[in-house]
Amino acid sequence: MAVHTNRQILTRGKNYATKQSKKFGTDEVTFDKDSRLDYLTGFHKRKLQRQKKAQEFIKEQERLRKIEERQKIRQERKEVMEEQLKTFKESLNLEAEIEDAKNDKTEDLQVESDESWHGFDSDKDDGDNDNNESSVKPILKKGAITEIYDDSTTVELETLEPNDNFEYLAQLNNVKLEKAEKVLKQSINRATKYAKFLGVDEKQKKKPRVKKFRYLTKNERRINQRKANDNKRRR
């Protein structure tokens, strides 16, 4: 039995492959004239179809963008409503504090009403209090100068002088210095809460301006293409 070389073995495999390809190959290639004519003459039609698809894609993107904007607006309105509800609750607390302050004032008035006249003994006590008040330096220093004119008229001149005795002044004006700091803090808190309720301290949020979509003109496309070609040449 003859021994086959490597070349003969490889050549035999090649012949077998070509034989198999011929067995399952195509016998004849036929073209559809109508389809061929449609392909060769339909460049403009396919271009219009691509443009139509691009416009539909842009419309769909615009629709999705509007939906997203409406969702953002709903979310902002929801946040505003929650903030207004919060301020409304704070205003209710403010009204409660005002009622408490009114109750405190009524209690002070009741205490003052208790200091009414209870007979001649109370007049004596009032006389003692007047003597104590006379020992305190008053806010007005009186210096009376009387001059007699021909028509018998008298003139009294009084000089104003500041008084540093705040306790005496507060007592005259029915003000309690012990509660002054507390009342001041309550007034500041009420003012800030009322300002928040009116929206004075909130800055108006400016909405970002949405850039509208537009097609480029023929000259703009030409300039952009020219710039792109120049960049390619530089590279």
UniProtKB/Swiss-Prot annotation:
Add the further remark from the entry.
Answer: Present with 2950 molecules/cell in log phase SD medium.
Q: Which residues carry this modification: Phosphoserine?
A: S113, S116, S122
Q: Which domain of life is it from?
A: Eukaryota
Q: Where is this region: Disordered?
A: 99-138, 209-235
Record GO biological process: generation of mature 5'-end of LSU-rRNA from tricistronic rRNA transcript (SSU-rRNA, 5.8S rRNA, LSU-rRNA); rRNA processing
Question: Which cell locations does it reside in?
Answer: Nucleus, Nucleolus
- What residue ranges carry the coiled-coil annotation? 49-110
Q: Which UniProt keywords apply?
A: Coiled coil, Nucleus, Phosphoprotein, Ribosome biogenesis, rRNA processing
Gene name linked to the record: RRP17
One of the record's GO cellular component terms: nucleolus
Signal peptide coordinates: none
Q: What is this protein called?
A: Ribosomal RNA-processing protein 17
Q: Which family does it belong to?
A: Belongs to the RRP17 family.
Q: Name one Pfam family in it.
A: Nop25
